[in-house]
Amino acid sequence: MEYSMNKISIVIAGPAYREFDIYYSIKLLRTHFPESEIILSSNDHLLLTHANRLGVFDKIVTVENSGELPSLKFESVSDRGQPIVCNNINKQIKTSLHGILEASHDLVLKIRTDQILMQNHIISLWNLIKDIPNDNKKTKGRIITSSIFSINPRFSERMPYHISDMLQFGFKEDLIRYYSAPEYPFDYSVWYETHIYASHSNRNENIFRSRYAVEQWLTMNYIFGVNTPFPIKYHNDISHKIIKDFEYIFPDFFIIAHPKDISLRASKFNSAMNYVNNQCYST
């Protein structure tokens, strides 16, 4: 079955983004994904008020603010004087899941408020990959995601199962499974305040405060299930076997697309694109 632009639900999740008004995101999405259902899911009351006033969304989902955890990493020298970025994993899970649950169509695009698709190329990619066979019996299909921070653990940050969480495109039931990860525990968020780093840790890895990266928590719960032990015990738990097993299994669950291949504008991460192009998986 070939999918078209008018058979999808688009879920935009997150707080207001300062670079541009969300009105322009919706206008562009309506152009390139005509007749699609567009849903806003947020706990940002100022954004919700603004969205209701605009009247451009098909549905608006108000989500309770579950609060933030301590920052994912300890402050480094280069971070001094910069605003502290807290760990928003539980807010992300809740806003994304509640929005996806409201989707009316079987095919769903979930995107952040600070990103936008400039064309509809993701539909062409989906129609290209949707029938590729795999050994995965847990999900209905694969999820298309971005190469932005889909980290290859052979390089400077050796974190397997670190698949980007910034964008998902796939079947509704698969996105529900992805965002049905359990609440991230507080003791995991401050893990390295009381635990010693692995002896092989490098400078990029030993600034982590959290036991796992957000992306690892979502990816491993999605692939292995909520009640199954993870194949890694901490963020940079690494071996040749772990990498081999990871690279064997993840293509059955994800297609990792370079932003250019899906016309993804993610200006917030422009400064990281050299890293993304050299150290992340990609189409």
Report the location of each language-model feature.
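Catalytic core and acceptor-binding pocket of nucleotide-sugar-dependent glycosyltransferases
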Residues: 117-124, 129-282
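N-proximal low-complexity "stem/linker" segments adjacent to membrane-targeting elements
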Residues: 1-21
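Active-site-proximal specificity loops/subdomain of glycosyltransferases
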Residues: 41-102
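Soluble or luminal CAZymes and related metallo-dependent hydrolases
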Residues: 14-21, 87-95, 210-214
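Short, well-formed alpha-helical segments that are part of the catalytic scaffolds
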Residues: 17-32
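Active-site acidic Asp-centered loop
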Residues: 111-112
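Short loop->beta transition adjacent to catalytic acidic/histidine clusters or analogous donor-positioning motifs
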Residues: 6-8, 30-40, 58
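Short aromatic/hydrophobic "clamp" motif used to bind/position activated sugar donors
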Residues: 108
